[in-house]
């Protein structure tokens, strides 16, 4: 009997071990199944939201200009240790939803020297008969994630300007890199890179390029020449939270069209001929230089003690409208975006009647005004301080020939009646400690935040950016 008991003990231990292994396996398989089911649920939400947005864009210009925000009903708290895993799941669901969406896809990049042509049809409701041909190609080694340059051409005959863009893109010393070189869809009054149909194209480009996975999301650059200089200056300010750097050339916008504060945290190059007097390009470039220099003096460092306004703005001596174009992209390529600045300056303005709904980690749920709102956010030691102002412009200089408003004064008053969502992550705050939010000098929030799936989904929908799948947020009425 004693020998039998000794024999039975290892057998019982073996059976217990097998049982434990099977139980753990069942738990693991169940967790995996639950994860797969949740990813499918999130993907279906993303796909339905993308289809809804697509229908809105096709329906009317007014609907596109409203630029509504979307909020999911999917809710689930997440432990801090599981944040990265869930962010990965959400981005995978976003990838799958974009892949399944029925739309014209971004062409696969080939060698830029081949000049392979592709095209997108832009929504008829935004611009009639708008077909945007483009080159999308790679320079140098295609290994790993590459920087992406968006080049905007000038306002000559569009076929000629587009062909010149391909020549320049191949010539510039910035490889290895990817280039997206579009042709303006229509000439005349639609020969503007900042109009709503083109906004549709830029947001589609960024969304699809970041999903494809061969683009470095922190190394996106926009630049252009002449009309493309005007366009890239506007896009630099409007979409600054996506760019690592921007480089208009031979342009010059009145700064009401491209507020310099938005270009905090990015590199900004602006080169114009000193004798380029057409439409006051040299004067307006000089005014931009003064504005950047003044902004740098007023706010030299961000909350992390890094330079806030890194810029190179030069009037090139002895040059008119044609300048040295090769100087810009090598300078731009030195910059890498910080997707999580603790100092955010944002003048929320309309471009062709359309406002952005978010910028960096801010999302506007309800604007305090139909006009302009200025947000000044600083994060330090888990305290989020935001000053929100309404902005009024008064022209103080106009040209006598065309009536172009050249210079402005701005006045600010405290904004009231808005609702703002502030997305946060461990790069911006300590997720284990209470967070305080102060708006216009008044404390609006003081408590701990919790990571959750809803904020990850909402922020992914808003920004379509792999670096901005935020695990938590705070909503503030003011």
Residue positions per predicted region:
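Gly/Ser-rich "nucleophile elbow"/oxyanion-hole loop immediately N-terminal to the catalytic nucleophile
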Residues: 139-144, 190-226, 240
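C-terminal catalytic histidine-bearing segment of alpha/beta-hydrolase fold enzymes
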Residues: 271, 277, 283-285, 297-395, ...
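Catalytic His-Asp charge-relay segment
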Residues: 265-273
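Short substrate-entry loop that stabilizes the transition state in hydrolases
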Residues: 141-191
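C-terminal beta-sandwich/jelly-roll accessory domains of carbohydrate-active enzymes
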Residues: 353-478
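A domain-start/cap signature at the N-terminus of enzymes
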Residues: 34-146, 445-478
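Active-site-adjacent alpha-helix of alpha/beta-hydrolase-fold enzymes
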Residues: 272-310, 399-419, 425-433
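Primarily recognizes the serine-hydrolase "nucleophile elbow" in alpha/beta-hydrolase
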Residues: 218-264
């Amino acid at each position: 009997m004693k020998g039998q008991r000794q024999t039975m003990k290892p057998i019982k231990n073996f059976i217990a071990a097998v049982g434990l292994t099977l139980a753990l396996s069942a738990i693991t398989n169940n967790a995996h199944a639950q994860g797969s089911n949740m990813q499918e649920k999130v993907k279906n939400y993303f796909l339905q939201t993308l289809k809804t947005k697509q229908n809105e864009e096709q329906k009317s210009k007014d609907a596109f200009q409203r630029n509504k925000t979307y909020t999911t009903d999917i809710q689930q708290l997440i432990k801090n240790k599981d944040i990265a895993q869930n962010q990965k799941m959400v981005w995978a669901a976003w990838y799958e939803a974009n892949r399944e969406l029925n739309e014209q896809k971004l062409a696969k990049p080939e060698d830029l020297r081949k000049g392979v042509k592709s095209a997108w049809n832009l929504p008829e409701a935004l611009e009639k008969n708008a077909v945007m041909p483009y080159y999308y190609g790679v320079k140098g080694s295609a290994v790993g994630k590459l920087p992406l340059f968006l080049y905007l051409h000038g306002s000559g005959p569009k076929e000629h300007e587009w062909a010149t863009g391909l020549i320049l893109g191949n010539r510039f010393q910035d490889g290895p890199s990817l280039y997206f070189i579009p042709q303006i869809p229509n000439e005349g009054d639609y020969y503007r890179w900042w109009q709503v149909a083109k906004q549709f194209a830029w947001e589609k480009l960024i969304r699809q390029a970041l999903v494809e996975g061969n683009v470095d999301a922190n190394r996106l650059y926009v630049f252009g020449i002449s009309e493309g200089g005007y366009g890239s200056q506007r896009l630099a300010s409007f979409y600054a939270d996506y760019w690592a750097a921007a480089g208009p050339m031979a342009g010059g916008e009145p700064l009401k069209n491209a507020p310099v504060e938005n270009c905090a945290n990015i590199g900004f190059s602006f080169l114009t001929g000193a004798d380029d007097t057409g439409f006051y390009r040299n004067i307006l470039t000089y005014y931009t230089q003064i504005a950047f220099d003044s902004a740098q003096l007023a706010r030299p460092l961000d909350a992390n003690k890094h330079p806030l306004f890194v810029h190179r703005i030069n009037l090139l001596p002895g040059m008119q409208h044609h300048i040295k174009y090769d100087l810009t992209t090598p300078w731009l390529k030195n910059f890498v975006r910080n997707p999580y600045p603790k100092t955010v300056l944002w003048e929320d303005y309309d471009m062709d009647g359309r406002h952005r709904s978010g910028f960096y980690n801010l999302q506007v749920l309800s604007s305090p005004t139909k006009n302009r709102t200025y947000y000044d956010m600083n994060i330090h030691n888990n305290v989020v301080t935001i000053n929100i102002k309404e902005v009024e412009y008064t022209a103080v200089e106009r040209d006598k020939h065309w009536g172009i408003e050249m210079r402005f004064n701005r006045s600010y008053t405290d904004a009231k009646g808005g609702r703002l969502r502030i997305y946060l992550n461990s790069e911006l705050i300590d997720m284990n400690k209470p967070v305080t939010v102060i708006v216009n000098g008044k404390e609006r929030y003081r408590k701990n935040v919790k990571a959750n799936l809803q904020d990850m989904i909402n922020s992914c929908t808003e920004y379509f950016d792999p670096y901005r799948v935020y695990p938590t947020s705070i909503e503030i009425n003011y």
